Each structure stands twice: as C-alpha cells, then as structure tokens.
Amino acid sequence: MKLLAATVLLLTVCSLEGALVRRQAEEPSVESLVSQYFQTVTDYGKDLMEKVKSPELQAQAKAYFEKSKEQLTPLVKKAGTDLVNFLSYFVELRTQPATQ
C-alpha cells in the first residue's frame, strides 16, 4: 500500500515539474517573430528579383502586355465614342429648349 502511494506521489510530482518546466520555457518574443517575418519577405523579394531578370520571363511579360493592348484598344475607343455620344446627347437637350 505504501509502495502504491509512493508511486502515485512520485508520478504526480514528476508531472507537475514537467508542467512547470513547460511554462517556464522561453516563448519567442514578438520582436523575433517580426524580424523573422521581414527576413523571409526580404528573401522572397531577392528570389523574385532574380527570377524577373531572366529574359524568358521578360519576353512572356512583353507578349502578355502586347496581347492585352491589342484586346483593350478597341474597347477603349468604343468607350470613348460612347461617352462622347452620351455627353453630346445631353448638350443637345440643353440647347434645344433655348432655341425654341
């Protein structure tokens, strides 16, 4: 019976000491987390700059912009024409009552 009580007491003390050690363990500070975050972002930025310098990526970007320009130019011209027509309609409405 004494052996059982001593075993339970020993296990309880060991588990409490383990919990105490875990609580006393040093948590990473906010400053170190922020510093680590900025270091990671900086590393990604450097990697990205190296990838952008490649001629293949530059050629792909140029082709994409040229294709976009070809597709958007007619739409912009049509939107400009529609806007001019819309505004001229209101100008005509405004001048008609004055002439009558």
Curated annotation (Swiss-Prot):
Q: Which GO terms describe its cellular component?
A: chylomicron; spherical high-density lipoprotein particle; very-low-density lipoprotein particle
Compartments (UniProt record): Secreted
For the biological process aspect of GO, one term held by this record is: negative regulation of lipid catabolic process
Q: Enumerate the UniProt keywords alphabetically.
A: Cleavage on pair of basic residues, HDL, Lipid transport, Oxidation, Phosphoprotein, Secreted, Signal, Transport
Q: Where is the signal peptide?
A: 1-18
Q: Which residues carry this modification: Methionine sulfoxide?
A: M49
Q: What is its main location?
A: secreted
InterPro entries attached to this UniProt entry: ApoA-II, ApoA-II_sf
Record has Secreted as a keyword: yes
Q: Which GO terms describe its molecular function?
A: apolipoprotein receptor binding; cholesterol binding; cholesterol transfer activity; enzyme binding; heat shock protein binding; high-density lipoprotein particle binding; high-density lipoprotein particle receptor binding; lipase inhibitor activity
Protease: present as a keyword of the record?
no
Q: Which residues carry this modification: Phosphoserine?
A: S54, S68
Function according to Swiss-Prot or TrEMBL:
May stabilize HDL (high density lipoprotein) structure by its association with lipids, and affect the HDL metabolism.
What family classification does the UniProt entry report for this protein? Belongs to the apolipoprotein A2 family.
Subunit structure as annotated in this protein's UniProt entry: Monomer. Interacts with NAXE and NDRG1.
Query: What is this protein's record name?
Result: Apolipoprotein A-II
